[in-house]
A protein has these predicted regions:
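Structural/interface elements that position substrates and couple domains in central-metabolism enzymes
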Residues: 2-505
Length: 505
C-alpha cells in the first residue's frame, strides 16, 4: 500500500533484523483509504506514536470491550521508527514482551484487519479520536550523568506533532493526550494550537474536544492489563471534552472493575501523573542515601527494610538498586518543576523533587565506584559479564536504563564487556546485540559477574548458582539484591561476593 520513490535511509528492526528503505515522498493516502474502506461505519481511532505505550494502546483499542474501532497508528518515517510501521503491517508486532496477551490481542487484530500503521499525516483527517502517545523529553545537560544539575525542556517536537493534528483533523475530533506532560499543557499549549490551526483553515474552533488521561503502562507480564484492567484518571478542557473522554475510555477499559476517576480539570490530571511518579522517584533517592550509610555502618539494609515493612504504614519503603531507569521516573519531577516556573510563573522550583532525580542519576556512577573500591585491582582488560540491561525486571525496555551509566564506566576503564538479558536482543541506545543464552555464556570464565537487572531468571535459580560456583574464582557483584543469604553463603565459599546496601559482607 505504500509507495517508495527515492530511498533516503534504512530503518532496521531490532526484532527481526530486517532492513526497510525509508521513502522520501511520504504519501500513504491510498493505503489509509483502502484500510478505512474495509471498516465502513466504524469510528477511526488514530494513535500518535508507536513506542512502548502507543503500539500497545493501539492493540487495546483494536480489542475494545464494547465497540469495534478501525485503529491506525502513526509514527515518523525515521530510522528509529519506520520499521515499526512496516512491522505492524507485515504481521510482526514491534514490541517484545512477556505478556501472552500481546500476541493474543495482535492475532485478534490481524484476523479482524482493524490495526494499520502509517507515516502519513493524512490519517488525521479520518480520525474521530486521536490518542497522543508521543515522547516529551527532558534534556539533561550532562550526558554522562556525573553532573546532572542542569536540564531543559524543549516542547518544539511535541508542538509540531499537535500542529500536524490541527492542520488535518476534523473540527469535532477528540484529541486525548496520554503523554506525560508538564502540568498546564493541555489548556495552555495543546488546545490553543488546535484552535489556531482550525481557525486558519476557516473551521470553527469551538467544536474541538481536548482531554488528558495519563497511562500507567507497565511493560512486562501484565502489559495489557496495565492499560485495560487498571484505574484511570481523566479530565477535559471543557465539559463536552470531559464527557467525550469518559465515553471513549469506557469502551476500552474495564471500568466496572476499575472505575474512572474524574478530576476538576486537565491541570489536575497532568499534575497527578508527575506527582505520582515524583513520589516514587523520591522514595528511591531516599533509599540511595541510606544504602550507602548501611555499607559504611556494616549493616544489611535489606534486613532493616524488611523489618520496617512489618509496620503497615511503611510497606512501600523501597530497596536499593543500581539506579532509576525507564521513561518516567528519570524526568517527570523535572517536567513538573519546569511547568511551575515556565507555565505558571513561579520563581520557585520543586527543589526536593529535582534533587531526587539528581541523586538517582548519579547512582550508576556510585555503583561503579563501589565496584572499584571493592575489587581492588585495575579494571583495564578485565572480562565483565553483565546480567541484565533493561531498566526493570522481566521487561525488555532499555530506555534510560541505569545499566547504561554502569556500562559506560566499565567501557571507559577498558573492560571487555559481555551482555546477557532474557528480554533484550538488541540494545538500541548502545547499538549492541545482547546474548540471550546464559548457559552458553557461562561456559566461558569472567573476572567480574554483575547482576544489573532483577529478572526472575536470576532469582532462586539453582542451576545458575551451581554454574556460578563452577566458575573460576571471580568477583560477583549484585547491584539489585537478587541473591539470598543462603546463595551468598554458598557463593562466598569460593568467590568474592558484594551486594549494594550490604555493609555486613
Amino acid at each position: 500500500m505504500m509507495t517508495t520513490d527515492t530511498i533516503q535511509n534504512i530503518s532496521k528492526s531490532p526484532v527481526t533484523g530486517k532492513e526497510y528503505e525509508i521513502p522520501v515522498i511520504q504519501d500513504d493516502k491510498a493505503g489509509i483509504d483502502a484500510f478505512i474502506a474495509l471498516h465502513p461505519g466504524k469510528k477511526v481511532v488514530v494513535v500518535q506514536g508507536l513506542g512502548f505505550v502507543g503500539s500497545v494502546m493501539g492493540l487495546v483499542v483494536a480489542n475494545a470491550l464494547t465497540e469495534e474501532y478501525a485503529v491506525i497508528g502513526i509514527d515518523l518515517p525515521t530510522t528509529a521508527s519506520y520499521w515499526k510501521i512496516r512491522s505492524i503491517n507485515e504481521g510482526i508486532f514491534p514490541v517484545i514482551a512477556s505478556d501472552p496477551k500481546i500476541d493474543q490481542y495482535y492475532q485478534n487484530a490481524l484476523k479482524k484487519k482493524n490495526y494499520y500503521a502509517t507515516y502519513d499525516a493524512h490519517v488525521y483527517s479520518k480520525a474521530d479520536v486521536v490518542v497522543v502517545d508521543i515522547n516529551l523529553d527532558v534534556k539533561k545537560k550532562s550526558s554522562d550523568k556525573q553532573d546532572p544539575e542542569g536540564y531543559s525542556v524543549d516542547l518544539s517536537p511535541f508542538k509540531k506533532a499537535i500542529e500536524a493534528i490541527g492542520i488535518n483533523c476534523k473540527e469535532d475530533v477528540l484529541v486525548l493526550v496520554e503523554t506525560t506532560v508538564p502540568p498546564g499543557t493541555s489548556k495552555k499549549i495543546v488546545r490553543p494550537i488546535l484552535e489556531e490551526c482550525l481557525t486558519k483553515r476557516g473551521l470553527p474552533a469551538d467544536k474541538i474536544k481536548v482531554g488528558h488521561s495519563y497511562e500507567r503502562v507497565m511493560p512486562g507480564p501484565k502489559y495489557i492489563d496495565s492499560i485495560q484492567n487498571f484505574y484511570r484518571v481523566f479530565a477535559g478542557t471543557d465539559e463536552k471534552s470531559t464527557e467525550a473522554v469518559e465515553t471513549f475510555l469506557r469502551t476500552v477499559i474495564r471500568t466496572d472493575e476499575y472505575p474512572l476517576t474524574r478530576l476538576g480539570n486537565t491541570n489536575a490530571t497532568e499534575m497527578a501523573k508527575v506527582l505520582e511518579n515524583s513520589f516514587r522517584a523520591m522514595n528511591i533517592a531516599f533509599m540511595v542515601e541510606w544504602s550507602r550509610f548501611a555499607e559504611e555502618a556494616g549493616v544489611d539494609i535489606y534486613e532493616v527494610v524488611n523489618a520496617i515493612r512489618m509496620r503497615p504504614t511503611h510497606k512501600n519503603i523501597m530497596l536499593p538498586g543500581l539506579g532509576v531507569g525507564g521513561y518516567c521516573l528519570t524526568k517527570d519531577p523535572l517536567l513538573a518543576s519546569w511547568a511551575r516556573m515556565n507555565l505558571f510563573g513561579s520563581e520557585e522550583r520543586l527543589g526536593q523533587s529535582e534533587k531526587g532525580v539528581h541523586i538517582n542519576d548519579k547512582m550508576p556512577l556510585y555503583a561503579f565506584e563501589f565496584l572499584q573500591s571493592q575489587y581492588k585491582e585495575a579494571l583495564a582488560g578485565k572480562k565483565v559479564l553483565l546480567l541484565g540491561v533493561s531498566y526493570l525486571n522481566d521487561v525488555g525496555d532499555t530506555r534510560y536504563t541505569p545499566v547504561e551509566g554502569f556500562y559506560d564506566q566499565l567501557e571507559i576503564e577498558g573492560c571487555e564487556i559481555v551482555l546477557h538479558d532474557p528480554h533484550v536482543k538488541y540494545w538500541e541506545e548502545k547499538d549492541v546485540w545482547v546474548n540471550q543464552d546464559l548457559d552458553e555464556l557461562l561456559k566461558d570464565s569472567y573476572n567480574i559477574i554483575a547482576i544489573t537487572t532483577g529478572h526472575k531468571d536470576y532469582r532462586n535459580n539453582e542451576s545458575l548458582i551451581n554454574k556460578l560456583i563452577d566458575q573460576p574464582v571471580s568477583f560477583l557483584y549484585d547491584t539489585i539484591g537478587v541473591l539470598t543469604n543462603e546463595e551468598i553463603k554458598r557463593l562466598s565459599a569460593k568467590h568474592i561476593v558484594k551486594v549494594i546496601g550490604r555493609g555486613d559482607l
